[in-house]
Curated annotation (Swiss-Prot):
Any Pfam family matching the protein: MMR_HSR1
GO molecular function, one term: GTPase activity
Protein's name according to its UniProt entry: GTPase Era
Domain (KH type-2) ranges: 205-281
InterPro entries xrefs: G_ERA_dom, GTP-bd, GTPase_Era-like, KH_dom-like_a/b, KH_dom_type_2, KH_sf_prok-type, P-loop_NTPase, Small_GTP-bd
Protein's GO biological process: ribosomal small subunit assembly
Organism: Chromobacterium violaceum (strain ATCC 12472 / DSM 30191 / JCM 1249 / CCUG 213 / NBRC 12614 / NCIMB 9131 / NCTC 9757 / MK)
Protein purpose: An essential GTPase that binds both GDP and GTP, with rapid nucleotide exchange. Plays a role in 16S rRNA processing and 30S ribosomal subunit biogenesis and possibly also in cell cycle regulation and energy metabolism.
Region named G3: 62-65
GO CC annotation, single: cytosol
Entry's localization field: Cytoplasm; Cell inner membrane
Amino acid sequence: MTDTPFHCGFVAIVGRPNVGKSTLMNHLIGQKISITSKKSQTTRHRVTGIHTEDAAQFVFVDTPGFQTYHKGALNEALNKSVKDSLGSVDCVLFLLEAMRFTAADREVMALLPKKTPVILVVNKLDKAKDKLTLQAFIDEVTAEFEFAGVEVVSAKHGQRLAELLDQVRPHLPESMPLYPEDMITDKNERFLAAEIVREKLFRYLGEELPYEMNVEVEMFEMDGALRRIHIAVLVDKEHQKPIVIGRGGEKLKKISTEARLDMEKLFDGKVFLQVWVKVKSGWADDVRFLREFGLD
């Protein structure tokens, strides 16, 4: 009896902002590593999530939402990240919100590779009132691009994800696993700590959050079993600092507390976290800063 061949490959998750890409990846790997928010382009780095099973390893790449509304070096770098991801994967998941096929979706569709299998993933299936309406929507989309497959899911509730993996699996090349079977991301704890703080900023500041905002880990040290982490929130202008800090420091305190609790859960250990805000004018349009933050 011959052994079942192992398959391993890279899968890009692409779509317009706020369509559920990060939520989908978090559910596919069974762990929250990519931050989620209603604000566009929450994901600013290509985050890799790994799902391993008996005969296959899926390496998912969560990309920033492609959009042209914001201008400047930061947005150009994020859009470039999407394009680069599409050129180096074995399969692409093109994520759409059910019953919404917008100009922004078509912009992403125009980037889809012709020689790499692309699976249409229709998310938020509860948006469709019945199966006939949903099928008509799918027919409209598939008339504009030749997809390798179609799957309807609910990323938020983790529904039909096994069926989605079944569609992806045949497109993975025969290969030994690239990562240990218990590894869920190639990002280190320093990166994940920064992402957790960014998520809390999005959650507590909402529409007040400056687009030109980033976080920088200034210290990450192990003190026995304790992680000591110092993180600076970077804003572009002085008047943006009070937005993040809040009256009497209340917002920043909530952000820091919730971030620390999430880190302790993810890292399975105690964390001492300090977060503060500082101005770094022009960073979002300075290619040197973007390169420093890995956003070039």
